[in-house]
Amino acid sequence: MFGAELVGRETGGQSTDQPYSYRDSARTWDTVTQSVLKAPGWEDSYAVITIEADKHGNGAHQETVAPSDLRQYAKLANASQILYAPLIFVTKLSIFLLYLRVFASARRGMTYLSIHLLIWFNLAFYLANFFLKIFQCIPRAKIWDSNTSGHCININIPILVTAAINVVSDLLMLCLPIICVWRLQMSIRRKLGISAIFAAGIFGCFASIMRLEVSVRDRNTKDPTYDWYTEITCGILASCLPALPTFFRHFFGKARTMLSRSRTRGSSNRSQDRSLEKATELYTLTYPRGQKHHIITDNRLIDQDRELDDDRTQIFSGPSYAVTEARVEGRTPLGQRAYHGDDTVLNGEDGSGHCRGILKVVEVDVESGPGHPTVKCRCDNW
């Protein structure tokens, strides 16, 4: 592990409990993303520097880093410090421009002036910070090689000033949109929801405050490989949070569409299955004489060549058969007169062959099955 590799080599025999080696960090050429390949920008250079610095002790305590790595790290750290000012300014500028578009589209009023004042103040401050980091040592080689003759400024003073101004700037950025939201004409519930989105920027404020506290407490210590990276990460996350509602609406909208399509397909399949299943239906009819007449329809698949001996039942021939039976309770079955498909009349009479006269006519539609014609059955009670 890291301790076993480093002890006795260049750390002066110091041991460490760190469970990994900073030299095993991801290399620059291992980190290739589609977005970087599509649209690389100058800000991507900061990521390249950071990834390269990881294998020279970035994020590890300085006492655990080899001297040769510290020299290389100092070069990369100075490059990242130079980029720090424009990077943090661009992060804040993106938030300020969002505020202008949302809250000051009319280009007048106190909100518009306040946002522009913050933009120009941050521009001036971070521009000065940019040149300060470039010329912090003369010659510049003294930044990473203390044996080089020359002089350097006390870098702790700019760090403290930068941390303090970042805290004030971040708090103003946090309060400004919330004040604007509560001046809008909308429901309390919606105001709370929008305020919660912008209030997520409090993570950046916490990072600035913690950086200021650590800078004041450890101003006499030197551990440049471990500090001041949290603030930039939190700032970038905070600047992306206002876009989360749009992302979630897009994501959940597609999820609802896919779920709806799945349910529609499932419903269609179940409907088709139910069309293949026909339950027995019982119709009860009351006649003027007080007699109950039951017409029972039931799906039965019967071979065409099969003959039924029961003369009480008429069979409709075809690919599948629907049996219709009519009888009066307590009496012998009544005759039936049925119209089947091509309106062919099937005569049904009582046992004597005499038709008693029609008391009630009932028409029943029986579907033989999917793809087969509907059978119309007309039952006459004599």
Swiss-Prot record:
PANTHER family: PTH11-LIKE INTEGRAL MEMBRANE PROTEIN (AFU_ORTHOLOGUE AFUA_5G11245) (PTHR33048), SAT4 FAMILY MEMBRANE PROTEIN (PTHR33048:SF160). The keyword Transmembrane applies. This is SAT4 family membrane protein. Keywords: Glycoprotein, Membrane, Transmembrane, Transmembrane helix. Pfam families: Fung_rhodopsin (PF20684). InterPro entries: Rhodopsin_dom_fungi, SAT4-like. Residues 1-22 are annotated as: Disordered. One of its GO terms (cellular component) is membrane. It is a multi-pass membrane protein. It is found in: Membrane. It comes from Emericella nidulans (strain FGSC A4 / ATCC 38163 / CBS 112.46 / NRRL 194 / M139). The chain crosses the membrane at residues 80-100, 112-132, 159-179, 192-212, 228-248. Coiled coil: none annotated. Belongs to the SAT4 family. Its main location: membrane. Glycans are attached at N78, N147, N269.
